[in-house]
Curated annotation (Swiss-Prot):
Coiled coil residues, start to end: none
Catalytic site positions: 45 (proton acceptor)
Source organism: Klebsiella pneumoniae subsp. pneumoniae (strain ATCC 700721 / MGH 78578)
Family per record: Belongs to the HpcH/HpaI aldolase family.
Example of a GO cellular component annotation carried by this entry: cytoplasm
UniProt gene name: hpcH
Protein name, per record: 4-hydroxy-2-oxo-heptane-1,7-dioate aldolase
Length: 265
């Protein structure tokens, strides 16, 4: 077993991603052929559940793009189900401290290293027990990315980085800017300073920094600073803005939209 996304991060190869929020296997497959290194299937802010995640994993599987799945919460039960349907790389939201980071890691590991329940006869992940010795190989194939999104998490970042099994740390600029008192303005200088400092700390600890940023100039800046997994857009935004722009060229019904150059998404 291997995890190409995890291998790329370990090798220090920057990975460019796209956020998926349409909850559609059809659009997921369409975007899997677009050339992104990874695609984030969002279960926190998009109305995904285990069955919809499963169909998107199946749709992406034939393509080079690697799936990353975000559960709605740092919940071992939900994580167990996502792993069983085939997720190998998880982006765990709102991790505040080392204890919560350890919980996320343990949820992805079979005992004695963790608390993942054994049900491989029922699991797509093991090809229904057709993967030889799956239970002894699976732990090493897991990639755990934790999200830091508050001032408390930033304060605890050194301890989070010390947690064995955390492969990367994703900085959530939207929630972080809100927590810092600059909601809706992730480009505020205080927020940007915090993000840049966090990227440097994460790299110095030998982990992979990640972020989502639709502003092209900022996304490139984060890559220059050493971010290794950077999502540069969102499927819902691409569809909405593209449709609005097309309508505006032919009708008088142009919709007022958010300036994406000032937004995370």
């Amino acid at each position: 077993m291997n995890n190409a996304f995890k291998d790329a991060l370990k090798a220090g190869r920057p990975q460019i991603g796209l956020w998926l929020g349409l909850c559609s296997s059809y659009s997921a497959e369409l975007l899997a052929g677009a050339g992104f290194d990874w695609l984030l299937i969002d279960g926190e802010h998009a109305p995904n559940n285990v069955p919809t995640v499963l169909t998107q994993l199946q749709a992406i599987a034939p393509y080079p793009s690697q799936p990353v799945v975000r559960p709605s919460w740092n919940d071992p039960v939900q994580i167990k189900q996502l792993l069983d349907v085939g997720a190998q790389t998880l982006l765990v939201p709102m991790v505040q401290n080392a204890e919560e980071a350890r919980l996320a890691v343990r949820a992805t590991r079979y005992p004695p290293a963790g608390i993942r329940g054994v049900g491989s006869a029922l699991a797509r992940a093991s090809r229904w027990n057709r993967v030889p010795d799956y239970i002894h190989q699976a732990n090493d194939a897991m990639c755990v990315l934790v999200q830091i999104e508050t001032r408390e998490a930033l304060k605890n970042l050194p301890q989070i980085l010390d947690v064995d099994g955390v492969d990367g740390v994703f900085i959530g600029p939207a929630d972080l800017s809100a927590d810092m008192g600059h909601g809706g303005n992730p480009q505020h200088p205080e927020v940007q300073a915090a993000i840049e400092d966090a990227i440097q700390q994460i790299r110095q600890a030998g982990k992979a920094p990640g972020i989502l940023m639709a502003n092209e100039q900022l996304a490139k800046r984060y890559l220059e600073l050493g971010a290794l997994f950077v999502a540069v857009g969102v499927d819902t935004t691409l569809l909405a803005r593209g449709a609005e722009a097309l309508a505006a060229r032919f009708t008088h019904n142009a919709t007022t939209t958010t300036d994406n150059n000032k937004s995370v998404y």
